């Protein structure tokens, strides 16, 4: 069954339709149907109903007279001599005499094609575009920067034979005509058909040689007709035709019965060729496809042009050079040779084409190759026309018609590049030919020389013959056999695309790639802006420019016809769009978000509107953790970093000088070696002639490069070349292009302090000017457009159109503005001072200077977009989309063959409130979370996941969304800066304010909070967009004037929304009480109708109305004026005794139109003032700043007093940073007093960012150079590492037993850097969030790491293991592992979280006037431990990072509680077991630089510097069953144990009374107990007994018998006794020191040193809000008064006295003697306490009274402190004799502090009395 028969069976419906078409062929007038279809006024006989055709139509019809039948011959269309009969001779380039050229018509049309052409032209005057030093050939050249811009200018290849820029329709028509005339057929029937249908051309294309070849071929075919079919004769051998022998042999049938039936998609049919009658369909199909294409084109081209079909259908005919097959839809391809693929994918036209004739045989006779050459020459001519059209930039037809057999997407490239889609089922004949090679082209070009053909047609023919003389490599190699389709159901594979650089028909884009130079040197045709295979998203980039691009190719000038047919509604929408402007196209880096950071630092957010740069290096202590030991020789790593943030790592020698380092860095940092630069290390400049080692440059140090030379850019105003695009998407394709090194620079200065929206680098903006016409015929805008200087795009506004701004532009004037996709803002030009230049610094530190072209002042923004509101779904979706886009782009960038892309989880820009769990769930569809070999988590791309295209990514996240989110972050930071953290919307604040008491301070604070929330960026933008989305119809819903005015002086608009029904205050109610009366007026003396003419006259005279004006008014006009004036004065609260204002006042209700008109008038007034203010060249802009800010300053003072006096017992600290704690401690308007705190935090952020960059650079190095060290993590406790002590070898040297806690605890307090805690926190960055400790110096951290347990009778220690649950639970109160804060077994269960604050304060508080040395017991045992303070000071930060597993099993006895200020090294050395074996000391190697000494040097231990000793016990005293290779590191007894009083043995005393006795110790032992609780607790009445019971219970689990337990109890009691004795001694010693101090007559101001209070005083930070499940955080001890500006007080001395007394109370609370008196005594601790004590008092109550400012003098304060001492003597004198001395000590210390502060207290008390 043949192919045609098979299709008949499959498509019976289509076959029937074709049979009907066959019947149409028999009709005599069949051609008239087509003519009637075209015009509709031609009858069946071919006569015209009315002769209304114009000359062009008659001319085209006359050209078709031979095809359309004899009926048209009788019509007098045109004179025969007027036009040639052959279409090929028609001069399509010549214009008719009456032709009107609409291409350059200047009509008033504000469409985008006009705007795009004029935007860049009017930014500057022509003289500004050229530099004085620039050389241009001719300013008046045809291609100028002032002409219409064209994105395709850079696409024109350097081809001298470019076609003239003509109409595409003319090109298509002429090309088709040439094809038709030059297409001889191989078959006689086809030749007859062509000759009968077309008129004879005057100039024949065929030469005499061609005719001879055709005759020879006909003779050869006639000879072999009766035998086998012969293709050609080569070397005497006959080559037969493959298709005739092996093809399907079918008898010759008539054309009517032998037509191949094909399915037709009725929906996509365009043309039905009913009048093409062929005698032999098979012969017709065997003819070249070019002939068929030309035949169809000449039949249908004019039809489509002249028809009334829609625009898209007409565009099909205009764009396609060759039409589709009969009754077939158009395909998704645009093959250059106009070959259209058949419908079916299994339809292969091999059997319907003489493909053998196209084979080029090297030695074949001339007669065999001539037909093929002729046919292919025609095809090549069409190809030339197509490629020349491409060179001109014409868009070829590539239509997105979906193929029903294949679903591959087709992308339409607007720059004319054709891409064969995957669904192509036909291989173009040209693709099978080998491209032209250089050597072949030279050989063939020599053929032209001897012939010397002068005719252009012959030259072209020879050129095509030369191109076709190549051999088919696929045919020679036999590879074409692999492409034969044997199975009809199998799709034809996609043809190969051969790139040949020597082929001038192939255009190559020169990208910035490595092979770019190679392409430039070898390609015959270039340069194309767009890539050959562009992505779908890059096509979307041109959608915004599609209208502008179509203006060049829109020959029909549709805009002039579409405007006339446009409806009124469409016209209004067009005006709105013209007013609002076009959507701008950003640069490629901005669209890819390359210019925007995923996460902004605090410094960037704080300075969001005024970014700050780093211009001078300073010491970064956070990077000290990466530095190595000092080395005097050998190689080391140095990181050279610029101030712009560019860092490069180098390998240098310690003996090298900075000069050699400069030479190494000169290449990578792009500066000349001779350039003068400076190197800084740790904030100090390095000398060039001294080695790095001599200048203390350590390994991994940062060397900052400061470049001092300034480069001048005198020619920076130059524009790019004329053939390059000036705006996106063609321009600014790389980040490096976004520079000010060339082009023009306009500086825009915003008048708003905090603009609502700010664009990032690379985002588009447009400068345009609106001109308000005086009349519809005003042409001033045209003159301004041609003579504009810095006006940008000129847009005219008709008098009936609305203004694009809130205010109206005056008639006849113009206003410039800056437009982006986010906002519109008016701009006002200013003159640039001659002394002003722009200083530019590159990321590599180069300084450059250039001129400034224009300077503008930007007015108030009118937003088009809403800023995200915090906590909303839109904000969360944005963060998730940002993470998704980041992951997708990273996956795409890391795609490599055989490698699955993966991303580290910690690299994702996760920001709150998004958590890792949400991110993991969101990325579940594209990536799997897996753990790497080193424990890092990675997101690995799923194998079945397809990365979205760039277009989808850009739609998912736009640059405008990033700007909105950054603006939200800046607004949130400002609220936090003001102390508003939880509120983001002012909803409900008005009703809440009504419930507040009638106090001015509280109402002012609430009003301030409400005002700050109203003027946030998200509220203002939301209000404006909501009120203006209907073309500013609801602008009256905005306040226009009020708190939202950014200027504060009436120069800006307030976008705060008016409250519909605001709560009316009492004062407002009183003011309008008169207006509320309505029904009680009638018939009384207040009735306005009863006013006579004279009475109304008298009232108006009293109101101040002129008498002349009154005389002109009638009675009712006078009454109306009386009502108006009375109502105005009553509403304003003005009263006049002589005028009864309230009687005639009436309530006024404005209509909607009146309200709208009033709002417009307000807007116009503000608009005029803004223009006048910002346009003024010289004016005192700050004249009224003092007046405007006076109210705010007064309010700020009142609010400060309120915040000082307000009581908040509990508040969250919220930050683990020392300096961040300082910032959080100063909330609200107190930031005014400590303005330097924000600068400190900005420095911290810079240091952290720099440290992160250093860490990244070091991580990228080899494994030997890595400094990625981590401290001993808390997770190591109770892990198998501690259980492998027997397996570790003792001989390893260089291992150190260190932890971040010890590094901080052992460092002397005087030398602790301010960033010590930051270093620790940075080191703990890898710890889990649950296990990260909040306090670096807290003893609780020591407990987590190490624990000492005492076993009576034994000196050895046993390990304690935890269960699985104990490893995961972390207590929020004490910070220990193994339980929760709600556990009753917790040592801090039921305690006030404030007590934990004292843990830190006590270890830091060592005032020199109170320090006492404990008794030193010098027994016969050796004291061997001595800690070098210098070692810990210098090696502390580094030691944190060098922590490694220790090759021995050890137990460290942590200081279970510090001994506060009395904890000295003298007391710490008290121990009866301090022996060390030399063997053990050698085996352990170097342990934290511990120095061993034979004797004690008392001078080495200053009394205020605690240095815990490290005791290494000899193995002789260790239990025998324990391994010998064990180091037991213990803290001394006095340091580690607690002083607990001996329990009274009288069994009659209640156990609860014992609680107070136990509290007499310096620190509570139960806080420091280890965490892994096991077993059931014993029954204990008090909490501290419970803590001791827990210790006993845990130890009991380790014991083997009850005897051990009893021994343990005895040992504990002995320890308590020793602790009590030491405590009593310390108390006596302190008393002696206090008395000695008092004897000193010279007053010495007490130093509040860093040991006492390291941080600034927390103004509310030490008051916490208890929350369940939140970890207790230590309060920030603070005293920064000497580093901060003096406090500003507005309520006299009460606040000052309160601050001084609060400081004294805080200092008392930090003292060890105050431990028992810090909080009230409860009945649980002492049941009979309140029966004896009538007036309880404690330091907590005193502090509360101080904060409430209840103390008016110091005597009242001291009286309460003395009450504490009196209560202590009354209750504890007989019960606990050691407690009263503590109270006396506290009172003495209070007297001392009061005496030290006597001067400031006198001033404060004097201010209170005044």
UniProtKB/Swiss-Prot annotation:
Pfam families: Bromodomain, DUF3591, TBP-binding, ubiquitin
Coiled coil: 1240-1260, 1627-1647
Residue spans of biased composition, Basic residues class: 1636-1646
Transcription regulation as UniProt keyword: yes
This protein's UniProt keywords: Activator, Bromodomain, Chromatin regulator, Coiled coil, Nucleus, Transcription, Transcription regulation
Domain of life (superkingdom): Eukaryota
Any one GO MF annotation of this record: RNA polymerase II general transcription initiation factor activity
SUPFAM superfamilies given in the database record: Bromodomain (SSF47370), TAF(II)230 TBP-binding fragment (SSF47055), Ubiquitin-like (SSF54236)
GO CC term (a single one): transcription factor TFIID complex
Binding partners and assembly: TAF1 is the largest component of transcription factor TFIID that is composed of TBP and a variety of TBP-associated factors.
Protein name: Transcription initiation factor TFIID subunit 1
Organism expressing this protein natively: Oryza sativa subsp. japonica
């Amino acid at each position: 069954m043949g192919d045609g028969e098979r299709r008949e069976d499959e498509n019976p419906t289509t076959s029937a339709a074709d049979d009907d078409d066959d019947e149409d062929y028999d009709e005599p007038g069949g051609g008239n149907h087509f003519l009637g279809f075209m015009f509709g006024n031609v009858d069946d006989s071919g006569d015209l109903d009315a002769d209304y055709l114009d000359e062009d139509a008659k001319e085209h019809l006359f050209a078709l007279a031979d095809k359309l039948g004899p009926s048209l011959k009788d019509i007098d269309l045109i004179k025969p001599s007027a036009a040639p009969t052959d279409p090929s001779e028609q001069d399509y380039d010549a214009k008719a005499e009456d032709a009107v050229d609409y291409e350059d018509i200047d009509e008033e049309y504000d469409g985008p094609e006009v705007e795009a052409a004029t935007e860049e032209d009017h930014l500057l005057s022509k003289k500004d575009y050229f530099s004085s030093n620039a050389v241009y050939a001719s300013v008046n050249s045809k291609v100028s920067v002032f002409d219409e811009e064209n994105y395709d200018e850079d696409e024109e290849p350097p081809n001298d034979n470019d076609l003239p820029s003509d109409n595409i329709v003319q090109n298509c028509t002429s090309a088709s005509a040439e094809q038709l005339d030059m297409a001889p057929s191989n078959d006689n029937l086809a030749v007859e058909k062509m000759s009968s249908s077309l008129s004879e051309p005057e100039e024949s294309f065929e030469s005499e040689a061609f005719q001879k070849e055709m005759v020879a071929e006909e003779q050869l075919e006639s000879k072999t007709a009766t035998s086998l079919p012969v293709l050609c004769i080569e070397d005497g051998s006959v080559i037969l035709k493959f298709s005739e022998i092996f093809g399907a042999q079918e008898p010759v049938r008539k054309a009517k019965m032998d037509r191949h039936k094909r399915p037709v998609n009725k929906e996509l049919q365009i043309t039905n060729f009913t009048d093409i009658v062929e005698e032999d369909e098979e012969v017709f199909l065997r003819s070249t496809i070019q002939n068929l294409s030309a035949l169809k084109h000449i039949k249908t081209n004019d039809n489509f042009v002249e028809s009334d079909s829609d625009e898209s259908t007409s565009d099909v005919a205009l764009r396609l050079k060759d039409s589709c097959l009969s009754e077939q839809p158009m395909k998704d391809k645009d093959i250059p040779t106009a070959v259209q693929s058949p419908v079916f994918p299994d339809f292969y036209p091999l059997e319907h084409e003489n493909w053998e004739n196209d084979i080029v045989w090297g030695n074949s006779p001339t007669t065999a190759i001539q037909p093929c050459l002729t046919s292919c020459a025609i095809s090549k001519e069409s190809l030339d026309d197509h490629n020349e059209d491409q060179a001109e930039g014409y868009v070829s037809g590539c239509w997105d018609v979906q193929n029903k057999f294949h679903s591959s997407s087709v992308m339409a490239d607007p720059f004319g590049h054709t891409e064969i889609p995957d669904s192509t089922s036909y291989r173009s004949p040209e693709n099978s030919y080998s491209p032209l090679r250089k050597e072949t082209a030279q050989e063939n070009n020599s053929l032209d020389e001897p012939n010397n053909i002068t005719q252009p047609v012959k030259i072209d023919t020879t050129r095509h013959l030369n191109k076709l003389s190549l051999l088919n490599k696929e045919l020679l190699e036999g590879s074409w056999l692999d492409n034969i389709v044997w199975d009809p159901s199998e799709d034809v594979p996609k043809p190969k695309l051969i790139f040949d650089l020597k082929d001038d028909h192939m255009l190559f884009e020169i990208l910035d790639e490595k092979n770019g130079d190679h392409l430039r040197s070898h390609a015959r045709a270039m340069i194309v802006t767009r890539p050959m295979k562009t992505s779908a998203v890059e096509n979307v980039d041109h959608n915004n420019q599609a209208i502008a691009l179509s203006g060049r190719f829109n020959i029909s000038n549709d805009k002039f016809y579409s405007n006339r047919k446009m409806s009124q509604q469409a016209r209004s929408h067009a005006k709105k769009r013209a007013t609002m402007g076009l959507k701008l196209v950003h640069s490629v880096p901005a669209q890819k978000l390359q210019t925007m950071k995923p996460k902004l630092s605090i410094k960037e957010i704080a300075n969001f509107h005024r970014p700050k740069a780093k211009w001078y290096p300073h010491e970064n202590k956070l990077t000290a953790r990466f530095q190595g030991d000092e080395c005097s020789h050998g190689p080391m790593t140095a990181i050279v970093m610029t101030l712009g943030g560019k860092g490069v790592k180098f390998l240098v020698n310690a003996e090298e000088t900075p000069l050699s380092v400069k030479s190494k860095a000169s290449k990578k940092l792009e500066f000349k070696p001779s350039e003068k630069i400076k190197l800084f290390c740790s904030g100090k400049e390095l000398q060039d002639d001294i080695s790095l080692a001599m200048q203390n440059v350590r390994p991994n140090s940062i060397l900052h490069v400061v470049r001092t030379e300034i480069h001048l850019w005198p020619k920076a105003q130059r524009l790019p070349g004329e053939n390059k695009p000036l705006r996106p998407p063609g321009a600014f394709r790389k980040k490096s292009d976004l520079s000010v090194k060339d082009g023009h620079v306009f500086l825009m200065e915003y008048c708003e302090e905090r603009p609502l929206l700010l664009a990032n680098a690379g985002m588009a903006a447009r400068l345009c000017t609106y001109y308000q016409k005086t009349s519809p015929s005003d042409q001033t805008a045209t003159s301004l457009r041609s003579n504009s200087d810095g006006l940008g795009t000129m847009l005219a506004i008709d008098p009936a159109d609305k203004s694009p701004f809130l205010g109206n532009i005056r008639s006849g004037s113009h206003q410039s503005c800056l437009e982006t996709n986010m906002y519109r803002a008016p701009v006002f030009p200013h003159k640039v001072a001659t002394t002003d230049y722009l200083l530019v610094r590159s990321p590599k530190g180069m300084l450059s200077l250039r001129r400034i072209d224009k300077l503008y002042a930007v007015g108030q923004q009118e937003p088009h977009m809403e800023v995200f509101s915090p906590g909303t779904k839109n904000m969360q979706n944005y963060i998730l989309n940002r993470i998704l886009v980041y992951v997708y782009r990273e996956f795409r960038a890391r795609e490599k063959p055989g490698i699955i892309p993966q991303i580290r989880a910690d690299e994702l820009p996760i920001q709150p409130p998004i958590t890792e769990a949400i991110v993991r769930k969101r990325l579940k569809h594209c990536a799997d979370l897996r753990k790497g070999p080193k424990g890092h988590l990675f997101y690995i791309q799923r194998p079945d996941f397809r990365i979205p295209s760039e277009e989808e990514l850009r739609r998912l996240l736009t640059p405008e969304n990033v700007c909105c989110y950054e603006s939200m972050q800046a607004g949130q930071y400002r609220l936090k800066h003001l102390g508003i953290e939880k509120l983001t919307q002012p909803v409900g604040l008005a009703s809440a304010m009504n419930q507040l008491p009638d106090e001015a301070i509280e109402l002012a604070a609430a009003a301030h909070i409400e005002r700050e929330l109203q003027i946030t960026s998200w509220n203002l933008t939301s209000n404006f967009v909501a009120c203006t989305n209907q073309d500013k119809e609801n602008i009256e819903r905005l306040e226009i004037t009020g708190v939202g005015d950014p200027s504060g002086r009436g120069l800006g608009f307030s976008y705060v929304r008016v409250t519909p029904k605001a709560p009316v205050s009492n004062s407002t109610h009183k003011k309008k009480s008169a207006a509320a009366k309505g029904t009680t007026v009638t018939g009384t003396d207040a009735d306005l109708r009863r006013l006579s003419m004279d009475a109304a006259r008298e009232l108006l005279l009293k109101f101040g109305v002129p008498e002349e004006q009154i005389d002109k008014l009638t009675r009712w006009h006078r009454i109306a004026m009386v009502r108006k004036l009375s109502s105005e004065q009553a509403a304003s609260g003005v009263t006049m005794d002589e005028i009864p204002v309230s009687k005639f006042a009436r309530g006024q209700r404005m209509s909607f139109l009146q309200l709208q008109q009033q709002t417009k008038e307000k807007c116009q007034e503000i608009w005029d003032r803004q223009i006048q203010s910002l346009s003024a060249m010289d004016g005192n802009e700050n004249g009224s700043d003092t007046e405007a800010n006076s109210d705010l300053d007064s309010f700020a003072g009142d609010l400060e007093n309120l915040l000082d006096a307000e009581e908040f017992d509990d508040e969250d600290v919220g930050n683990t940073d020392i300096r961040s704690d300082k910032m959080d401690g100063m909330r609200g308007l107190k930031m005014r007093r400590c303005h330097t705190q924000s600068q400190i935090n900005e420095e911290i952020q810079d240091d952290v960012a720099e440290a992160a960059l250093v860490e990244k650079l070091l991580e990228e190095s080899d494994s030997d150079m890595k400094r990625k060290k981590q401290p001993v993590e808390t997770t190591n406790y109770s892990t198998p590492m501690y259980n492998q002590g027997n397996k570790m070898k003792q001989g390893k040297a260089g291992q150190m037993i260190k932890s971040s806690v010890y590094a901080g605890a052992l460092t002397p307090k005087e030398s602790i850097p301010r960033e010590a805690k930051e270093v620790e926190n940075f080191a703990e960055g890898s710890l889990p969030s649950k296990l990260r400790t909040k306090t670096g110096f807290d003893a609780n951290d020591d407990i987590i790491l190490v624990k000492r347990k005492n076993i009576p009778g034994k000196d050895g220690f046993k390990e304690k293991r935890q269960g699985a649950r104990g490893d995961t639970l972390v207590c929020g109160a004490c910070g220990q592992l193994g339980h929760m804060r709600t556990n009753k077994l917790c040592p801090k269960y039921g305690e006030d979280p404030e007590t934990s604050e004292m843990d830190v304060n006590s270890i830091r508080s060592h005032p020199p006037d109170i320090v006492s040395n404990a008794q030193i017991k010098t027994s016969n045992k050796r004291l061997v431990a001595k800690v070098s303070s210098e070692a810990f000071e210098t090696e502390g930060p580094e030691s944190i990072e060098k922590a490694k597993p220790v090759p021995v099993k050890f137990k460290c006895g942590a200081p279970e509680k510090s001994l506060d200020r009395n904890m000295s090294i003298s007391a710490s050395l008290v121990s009866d077991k301090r022996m060390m074996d030399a063997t053990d000391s050698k085996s352990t190697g170097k342990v934290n630089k511990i120095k061993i000494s034979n004797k004690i040097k008392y001078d080495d231990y200053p009394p205020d510097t605690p240095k815990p000793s490290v005791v290494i016990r000899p193995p002789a005293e260790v239990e025998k069953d324990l391994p010998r290779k064990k180091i037991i590191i213990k803290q001394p007894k006095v340091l580690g144990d607690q002083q607990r009083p001996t329990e009274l043995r009288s069994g009659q005393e209640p156990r609860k009374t014992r609680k107070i006795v136990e509290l007499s110790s310096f620190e509570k032992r139960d806080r420091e107990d280890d965490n892994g609780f096991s077993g059931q607790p014993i029954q204990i009445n008090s909490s501290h007994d419970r803590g001791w019971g827990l210790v006993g219970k845990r130890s009991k689990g380790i014991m083997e018998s009850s005897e051990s337990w009893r021994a343990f109890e005895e040992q504990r009691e002995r320890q308590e006794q020793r602790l009590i004795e030491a405590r009593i001694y310390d108390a006596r010693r302190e008393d002696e020191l206090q008395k000695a101090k008092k004897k000193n007559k010279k007053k010495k101001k007490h130093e509040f040193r860093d040991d006492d209070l390291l941080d600034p005083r927390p103004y509310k930070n030490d008051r916490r809000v208890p929350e369940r499940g939140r970890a207790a955080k230590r309060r920030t001890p603070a005293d920064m008064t000497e580093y901060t500006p003096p406090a500003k007080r507005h309520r006299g001395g009460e606040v000052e006295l309160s601050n001084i007394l609060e400081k004294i109370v805080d200092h008392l609370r930090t003292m060890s003697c105050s431990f028992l008196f810090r909080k009230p005594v409860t009945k649980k601790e002492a049941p009979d306490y309140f029966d004896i004590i009538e007036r309880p008092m404690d330091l907590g109550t005193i502090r509360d009274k101080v904060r409430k400012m209840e103390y008016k003098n110091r005597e009242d304060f001291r009286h309460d402190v003395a009450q504490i001492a009196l209560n202590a003597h009354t209750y504890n004198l007989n019960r606990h004799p050691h407690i009263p001395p503590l109270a006396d000590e506290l009172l003495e210390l209070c007297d001392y502090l009061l005496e030290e502060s006597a001067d400031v207290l006198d001033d404060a008390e004097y201010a209170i009395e005044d």
